[in-house]
Swiss-Prot record:
Deletion consequences: Deletion of the gene prevents growth on N-acetylglucosamine, but has no effect on growth on glucosamine.
Record-linked InterPro entries: Amidohydro-rel (IPR006680), GlcNAc_6-P_deAcase (IPR003764), Metal-dep_hydrolase_composite (IPR011059), Metal_Hydrolase (IPR032466)
Keywords: Carbohydrate metabolism, Hydrolase, Iron, Metal-binding
Family the entry assigns: Belongs to the metallo-dependent hydrolases superfamily. NagA family.
Natural source organism: Bacillus subtilis (strain 168)
Name under which the protein is recorded: N-acetylglucosamine-6-phosphate deacetylase
Length: 396
């Protein structure tokens, strides 16, 4: 059972304000107190916050293939063990394990593995929670494949999706697809009926088709700017529609590579902090040295902050969530409340779990992260358990 904790003298980023020199109490894995005054009840452990640190809701990464040597498509318990245990280092307290376009049997194995791991292993770990699965492909456009292997791309297939969702035990929460590959929007309509997010991505659709897809139930955009038709003033394409259409919540990889800092700022200005979600889209090389790694059956060369296929195509990222938050502070001068929105609250709302995650609120899961003024992670708490403490946090 998680111990009772008291975090004291810290700036607390709540839904509506930043409480200075506040207190957050944790009992039985839940937030029990958020106050400007010290609670009267005793706690088994007290955490004195470092000077100028900030308490945020735990970050939720809804689009992550892997990191630290692991990849969702490895379809092994050790893969999810690694992701769950290492993601708190970057402030992530929950995530969607993300697949890639592959041979159908390989996708099935990854889905079954996630279901079985969550049932058998997760409760014994003190790390990030697996909220479900983001199925990226294979129902995408070969014209905008990006790093999705073209040989396994196929048109949308509702029956195949139903099979996969059964194998996943209902864990598929987001499906990235191209609407032009979904005849009569059959899959989009099915996803809406099942309360699964239909995300437009790896698509060459025009604005009219996307607007029709939104009417059918599409509500999300996968990694804005990447693997999609570009903006033109006479045909806004996917980018223009994502920015201007109020019906779409939009993902963004804020690494300064997948999108220029000004493009990231434009996304923030257009969508505001209520309809933008930071993601990493990271692959297994995150946290490792430069070198050649496998991603979706392809060789990816990692140098510095970039991961590229042999033809120069970007192949996922090696971004960490706290780095994305820092970049957005730099690119947009946004507030800490904005950061809480785009790293946690919006994802929780989109997934329909805002009743238990996504904000520093009494009664919710104690998923919390303490960061420095430049978004370095100092301490991460997952469901009331201390999952990560930085080496520099000697005073805690």
């Amino acid at each position: 059972m998680a111990e009772s904790l008291l975090i004291k003298d810290i700036a607390i980023v709540t839904e509506n304000e930043v409480i200075k020199n506040g207190y957050v109490g944790i009992n039985d894995g839940k937030i029990s107190t958020v106050s400007t005054e010290r609670p009267k009840e005793p706690y088994s452990k007290e955490i004195q916050a470092p000077a100028d640190s900030v308490l945020l809701p735990g970050m939720i990464d809804i689009h992550i293939h892997g990191g630290y040597g692991a990849d969702t498509m490895d379809a092994s318990f050790s893969t999810l063990d690694i992701m769950s245990s290492r993601l708190p280092e970057e402030g992530t307290t929950s995530f969607l394990a993300t697949t890639i376009t592959q041979e159908h049997g390989n996708i099935s194995q990854a889905l079954v593995n996630a279901r079985e791991w969550k049932a058998a292993e997760e409760s014994s770990l003190l790390g990030a929670e697996l909220l479900g699965i983001h199925l990226e492909g294979p129902f995408v456009s070969p014209k905008r494949a990006g790093a999705q292997p073209k040989e396994w791309i196929r048109p949308s297939d509702v029956e195949l999706f139903k099979k996969w969702q059964q194998e996943a035990g209902g864990l598929i929460k987001i499906v990235t697809l191209a609407p032009e590959e979904d005849q009569h929007f059959e899959l989009i309509r099915h996803l809406k009926d099942e309360s699964i997010i239909a995300s437009m991505g790896h698509t060459d659709a025009d604005s009219a088709l996307l607007s029709d897809a939104a009417k059918a139930g599409a509500s999300h955009m996968t990694h804005l700017y990447n693997a999609m038709s570009p903006f033109h003033h006479r045909e806004p394409g996917v980018i223009g529609t994502a920015l201007a259409h109020d019906g779409f919540v939009t993902e963004l990889i804020a690494d300064g590579i997948h999108s220029h800092p000004l493009a990231a700022k434009l996304a923030f200005l257009a969508k505001g902090s209520s309809k933008l979600i930071l993601i990493t889209d990271s692959m297994r090389a995150k946290g490792l040295k430069d070198g050649v790694y496998e991603f979706g059956g392809q060789s990816v060369t990692v140098r510095g902050r970039t991961a590229l296929l042999s033809d120069g195509t970007l192949a996922g990222s090696i971004l960490k969530m706290n780095e994305g938050a820092r970049h957005m502070r730099e690119f947009t001068n946004c507030s800490w409340t904005d950061i809480a929105n785009i790293t946690s609250e919006n994802a929780a709302k989109q997934l329909g779990i805002f009743d238990r995650k996504g904000s520093v609120t009494v009664g919710k899961d104690a998923d919390l992260v303490i960061v420095s003024s430049d978004c370095e992670v100092i301490l991460t708490i997952c469901r009331g358990n201390i999952a990560f403490i930085s080496k520099e946090a000697d005073q805690i």
